[in-house]
From Swiss-Prot:
Major localization listed first in the record, in broad terms: cytoplasm
PROSITE patterns: GRPE
Name of the gene: grpE
This protein's name: Protein GrpE
Keyword set, alphabetical order: Chaperone, Cytoplasm, Stress response
UniProt biased composition (Polar residues): 7-20
């Protein structure tokens, strides 16, 4: 009993002080839990936003994969179209012996180009257009008085777009202004 009295004398707290301490502890605990809740809610929002971004990126990747899946295959077919066009260029349209073969090649080329167009492959034939470095590759420059400088004079190889994206640039010859001709002998005199 004496020990209990000594303990009571050592802790001379009143019940009001004890309740105040408990209230402070509870208030601190509530504040700590509110901070943890806010942090958890913030983390939950960030995770939800990240999931939405991942889902959106995955959808875009799938869309691009579908859109450009034909890129390699279409690129390989362009050599076939080029060969058919060269064959037509080199054959004489007036030669009766090759006329049926020429018509067959023309129909085959038309069928191939129509098929490519159905799959959003667009042919670029820039003859006479202004040079566009985004769609054309200049192979040479040639002086010309017939067209404006910077225009496409000749097309060595047609270019192609797949779904609006450049698959192959057109290989072209670009015009340039003629150099001033040296004065003739008559002009010197």
């Amino acid at each position: 009993m004496a020990d209990e009295q000594n303990l009571d004398n050592q802790n001379p707290e009143t019940p009001e002080q004890s309740q105040a301490d408990v209230a402070e502890d509870l208030a601190a605990r509530v504040q700590s839990l509110e901070e943890q809740l806010a942090a958890a809610q913030d983390q939950s929002l960030r995770v939800a936003a990240e999931l939405q971004n991942i889902r959106r990126r995955a959808e875009q990747d799938v869309e691009k994969a579908h859109k450009f899946a034909l890129e390699k295959f279409a690129g390989d077919l362009l050599a076939v179209a080029d060969s058919l066009e060269r064959g037509l260029e080199l054959s004489n349209p007036d030669d009766e012996a090759v006329k049926p073969m020429r018509e067959g090649v023309e129909l085959t080329l038309k069928l191939l180009l129509d098929t490519l167009a159905r799959h959003q492959l667009e042919q670029l034939d820039p003859h006479g257009e202004p040079f566009n470095p985004e769609h054309h590759q200049a192979m040479a420059m040639e002086e010309s008085t017939h067209v404006e400088p910077g225009s496409v004079l000749k097309v060595f190889q047609k270019g192609y777009l797949l779904n609006g994206r450049l698959l192959r640039p057109a290989m072209v010859v670009v015009s340039k202004a003629p150099a001033d001709a040296p004065p003739s002998i008559d002009e010197k005199a």
